[in-house]
Protein backbone atom coordinates (compact mmCIF):
# COMPACT_ATOMS: atom_id res chain seq x y z
CA UNK A 1 0.00 0.00 0.00
CA UNK A 2 1.53 3.38 -0.97
CA UNK A 3 2.51 5.70 1.84
CA UNK A 4 0.93 9.09 2.45
CA UNK A 5 3.02 12.13 3.36
CA UNK A 6 1.28 14.61 5.66
CA UNK A 7 2.37 18.18 6.41
CA UNK A 8 1.08 19.43 9.77
CA UNK A 9 1.11 23.13 10.66
CA UNK A 10 -0.10 24.64 13.93
CA UNK A 11 -0.15 27.84 15.94
CA UNK A 12 1.04 30.47 13.47
CA UNK A 13 -0.28 33.26 15.73
CA UNK A 14 -0.11 35.91 13.00
CA UNK A 15 -0.45 39.46 14.34
CA UNK A 16 1.26 41.74 11.82
CA UNK A 17 1.95 41.66 8.06
CA UNK A 18 5.60 40.90 8.76
CA UNK A 19 4.55 37.69 10.51
CA UNK A 20 3.31 36.39 7.15
CA UNK A 21 6.81 36.59 5.66
CA UNK A 22 7.67 33.20 7.16
CA UNK A 23 5.30 31.62 4.65
CA UNK A 24 7.69 32.13 1.73
CA UNK A 25 10.29 29.99 3.51
CA UNK A 26 7.68 27.40 4.43
CA UNK A 27 6.50 27.25 0.82
CA UNK A 28 10.00 26.43 -0.39
CA UNK A 29 10.22 23.68 2.21
CA UNK A 30 6.82 22.35 1.16
CA UNK A 31 7.83 22.17 -2.49
CA UNK A 32 10.97 20.27 -1.55
CA UNK A 33 9.15 17.76 0.68
CA UNK A 34 6.10 17.33 -1.60
CA UNK A 35 3.43 16.19 0.90
CA UNK A 36 0.23 14.51 -0.26
CA UNK A 37 -1.97 16.21 2.35
CA UNK A 38 -1.75 19.46 4.33
CA UNK A 39 -3.34 19.84 7.77
CA UNK A 40 -3.72 23.09 9.71
CA UNK A 41 -4.35 22.61 13.44
CA UNK A 42 -5.56 26.09 14.38
CA UNK A 43 -4.55 29.30 16.16
CA UNK A 44 -3.98 31.45 13.12
CA UNK A 45 -3.99 34.74 15.05
CA UNK A 46 -1.88 36.07 17.87
CA UNK A 47 -4.65 37.13 20.21
CA UNK A 48 -8.42 37.20 20.32
CA UNK A 49 -8.47 41.00 20.09
CA UNK A 50 -9.44 41.84 16.51
CA UNK A 51 -6.50 43.36 14.69
CA UNK A 52 -6.73 45.73 11.74
CA UNK A 53 -3.50 45.12 9.85
CA UNK A 54 -3.89 41.38 9.14
CA UNK A 55 -7.41 40.33 8.22
CA UNK A 56 -8.81 36.83 8.52
CA UNK A 57 -9.24 36.73 4.75
CA UNK A 58 -5.58 37.63 4.23
CA UNK A 59 -4.50 34.85 6.56
CA UNK A 60 -6.69 32.27 4.81
CA UNK A 61 -5.45 33.32 1.36
CA UNK A 62 -1.87 33.06 2.59
CA UNK A 63 -2.52 29.55 3.91
CA UNK A 64 -4.14 28.62 0.59
CA UNK A 65 -0.97 29.69 -1.22
CA UNK A 66 1.13 27.65 1.20
CA UNK A 67 -0.90 24.47 0.66
CA UNK A 68 -1.55 24.80 -3.10
CA UNK A 69 -1.97 22.53 -5.02
CA UNK A 70 -2.32 19.89 -2.30
CA UNK A 71 -5.61 19.00 -0.58
CA UNK A 72 -5.80 20.89 2.70
CA UNK A 73 -7.97 20.67 5.81
CA UNK A 74 -8.15 22.92 8.85
CA UNK A 75 -9.66 23.26 12.30
CA UNK A 76 -9.88 26.37 14.46
CA UNK A 77 -7.92 26.97 17.65
CA UNK A 78 -8.87 28.64 20.90
CA UNK A 79 -7.56 32.06 19.82
CA UNK A 80 -9.56 31.87 16.59
CA UNK A 81 -12.69 30.90 18.51
CA UNK A 82 -12.18 33.65 21.07
CA UNK A 83 -11.86 36.09 18.18
CA UNK A 84 -14.95 34.79 16.34
CA UNK A 85 -15.70 31.21 15.38
CA UNK A 86 -18.34 32.42 12.95
CA UNK A 87 -16.11 35.00 11.26
CA UNK A 88 -13.27 32.52 10.83
CA UNK A 89 -15.68 29.94 9.43
CA UNK A 90 -16.86 32.55 6.93
CA UNK A 91 -13.26 33.36 5.98
CA UNK A 92 -12.53 29.71 5.15
CA UNK A 93 -15.79 29.22 3.27
CA UNK A 94 -15.19 29.16 -0.47
CA UNK A 95 -11.44 28.74 -0.04
CA UNK A 96 -9.45 25.73 -1.22
CA UNK A 97 -8.93 24.74 2.43
CA UNK A 98 -11.74 22.65 3.91
CA UNK A 99 -12.65 23.75 7.43
CA UNK A 100 -13.60 20.50 9.11
CA UNK A 101 -15.11 21.40 12.48
CA UNK A 102 -16.92 18.46 14.10
CA UNK A 103 -17.42 16.64 10.84
CA UNK A 104 -15.92 13.91 8.68
CA UNK A 105 -14.77 14.14 5.07
CA UNK A 106 -13.90 11.13 2.92
CA UNK A 107 -11.20 11.64 0.30
CA UNK A 108 -8.94 9.58 -1.94
CA UNK A 109 -5.16 9.82 -1.55
CA UNK A 110 -2.70 7.68 -3.50
CA UNK A 111 -5.47 5.28 -4.37
CA UNK A 112 -6.68 4.97 -0.78
CA UNK A 113 -10.06 6.09 0.54
CA UNK A 114 -9.41 7.88 3.83
CA UNK A 115 -11.70 9.69 6.25
CA UNK A 116 -10.53 12.88 7.92
CA UNK A 117 -12.34 13.68 11.15
CA UNK A 118 -12.08 17.23 12.39
CA UNK A 119 -12.94 17.93 16.03
CA UNK A 120 -13.68 21.40 17.38
CA UNK A 121 -11.31 22.78 20.00
CA UNK A 122 -12.05 21.42 23.47
CA UNK A 123 -10.07 24.16 25.24
CA UNK A 124 -12.42 26.91 24.01
CA UNK A 125 -15.60 24.85 24.25
CA UNK A 126 -16.22 23.93 20.61
CA UNK A 127 -15.57 20.19 20.87
CA UNK A 128 -18.37 17.74 20.07
CA UNK A 129 -18.19 13.98 20.27
CA UNK A 130 -18.11 12.56 16.77
CA UNK A 131 -17.89 8.87 15.95
CA UNK A 132 -16.07 7.53 12.92
CA UNK A 133 -18.71 6.49 10.35
CA UNK A 134 -18.87 2.85 9.28
CA UNK A 135 -18.14 3.91 5.69
CA UNK A 136 -14.61 4.80 6.74
CA UNK A 137 -13.78 1.10 7.14
CA UNK A 138 -11.35 1.91 9.95
CA UNK A 139 -9.26 4.09 7.62
CA UNK A 140 -9.38 7.44 9.37
CA UNK A 141 -7.26 10.21 10.80
CA UNK A 142 -8.33 12.86 13.29
CA UNK A 143 -7.37 16.54 13.42
CA UNK A 144 -8.03 18.90 16.33
CA UNK A 145 -6.36 21.82 18.09
CA UNK A 146 -5.94 20.90 21.77
CA UNK A 147 -4.74 17.28 22.06
CA UNK A 148 -7.05 16.78 25.05
CA UNK A 149 -9.88 16.60 22.52
CA UNK A 150 -8.41 13.40 21.08
CA UNK A 151 -8.89 11.31 24.22
CA UNK A 152 -11.71 8.82 24.73
CA UNK A 153 -13.21 8.34 28.22
CA UNK A 154 -10.69 5.50 28.62
CA UNK A 155 -7.80 7.91 27.92
CA UNK A 156 -7.01 6.23 24.62
CA UNK A 157 -6.97 7.62 21.09
CA UNK A 158 -9.21 6.09 18.41
CA UNK A 159 -7.33 6.91 15.22
CA UNK A 160 -4.06 8.22 13.90
CA UNK A 161 -4.34 11.78 15.22
CA UNK A 162 -2.84 15.25 14.87
CA UNK A 163 -3.00 18.35 17.08
CA UNK A 164 -1.16 21.50 18.12
CA UNK A 165 -1.94 24.09 20.83
CA UNK A 166 0.75 23.25 23.37
CA UNK A 167 3.75 24.97 21.73
CA UNK A 168 5.64 22.07 23.37
CA UNK A 169 5.48 24.24 26.48
CA UNK A 170 6.88 27.35 24.69
CA UNK A 171 9.14 28.03 27.68
CA UNK A 172 10.79 24.94 29.18
CA UNK A 173 13.66 24.62 31.64
CA UNK A 174 16.23 21.85 32.15
CA UNK A 175 15.12 19.10 34.54
CA UNK A 176 11.66 20.56 35.29
CA UNK A 177 10.43 21.11 31.74
CA UNK A 178 7.62 23.56 30.99
CA UNK A 179 5.95 24.99 34.11
CA UNK A 180 2.71 25.70 32.22
CA UNK A 181 1.16 23.73 29.37
CA UNK A 182 -2.46 24.83 28.79
CA UNK A 183 -4.07 21.45 28.19
CA UNK A 184 -5.69 18.64 30.14
CA UNK A 185 -3.94 16.12 27.92
CA UNK A 186 -1.43 13.93 29.77
CA UNK A 187 2.26 14.77 29.59
CA UNK A 188 3.03 12.20 26.90
CA UNK A 189 0.70 14.15 24.58
CA UNK A 190 2.26 17.56 25.16
CA UNK A 191 4.81 17.40 22.35
CA UNK A 192 5.77 15.19 19.45
CA UNK A 193 4.76 11.57 18.95
CA UNK A 194 2.50 9.62 21.30
CA UNK A 195 0.89 6.17 21.38
CA UNK A 196 -2.35 5.54 23.25
CA UNK A 197 -3.64 2.57 21.26
CA UNK A 198 -4.01 5.10 18.46
CA UNK A 199 -0.82 6.92 17.52
CA UNK A 200 -0.41 10.61 16.80
CA UNK A 201 1.68 13.75 16.66
CA UNK A 202 1.34 17.02 18.55
CA UNK A 203 3.09 19.85 16.72
CA UNK A 204 4.92 22.48 18.71
CA UNK A 205 3.82 25.01 16.11
CA UNK A 206 5.42 28.09 14.66
CA UNK A 207 4.33 31.12 16.68
CA UNK A 208 4.17 32.21 20.29
CA UNK A 209 1.44 33.36 22.62
CA UNK A 210 1.30 35.85 25.53
CA UNK A 211 5.06 36.48 25.36
CA UNK A 212 7.09 36.60 22.09
CA UNK A 213 9.55 33.98 23.28
CA UNK A 214 10.33 30.30 22.94
CA UNK A 215 12.93 28.80 25.22
CA UNK A 216 14.07 25.21 25.67
CA UNK A 217 15.38 22.31 23.59
CA UNK A 218 11.98 21.06 22.40
CA UNK A 219 10.20 24.38 21.96
CA UNK A 220 11.82 25.66 18.77
CA UNK A 221 9.23 26.69 16.15
CA UNK A 222 8.60 24.21 13.38
CA UNK A 223 6.17 22.11 11.41
CA UNK A 224 5.80 18.37 11.08
CA UNK A 225 6.24 16.03 8.12
CA UNK A 226 4.80 12.57 8.72
CA UNK A 227 5.04 9.59 6.39
CA UNK A 228 2.12 7.23 6.96
CA UNK A 229 2.63 3.70 5.70
CA UNK A 230 -0.92 2.64 6.51
CA UNK A 231 -4.06 4.16 7.98
CA UNK A 232 -6.02 1.69 10.05
Kindly label every feature range from the protein language model.
Residues 22-108:
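Core catalytic region of metal-dependent phosphoesterases/phosphodiesterases
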Residues 1-36:
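N-terminal signal-anchor transmembrane helix
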Residues 9-10, 37-43, 71-78, 100-103, ...:
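Active-site neighborhood of phospho(di)ester-bond hydrolases with catalytic His/Asp-centered motifs
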Amino acid sequence: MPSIRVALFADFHFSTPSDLEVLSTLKRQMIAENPDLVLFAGDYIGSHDLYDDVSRETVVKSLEALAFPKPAFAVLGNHDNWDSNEAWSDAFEGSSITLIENQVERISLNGQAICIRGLGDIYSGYWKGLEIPAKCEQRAITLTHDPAGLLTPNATVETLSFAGHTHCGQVAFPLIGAPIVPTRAPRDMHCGQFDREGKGVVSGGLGSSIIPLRFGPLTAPGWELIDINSVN
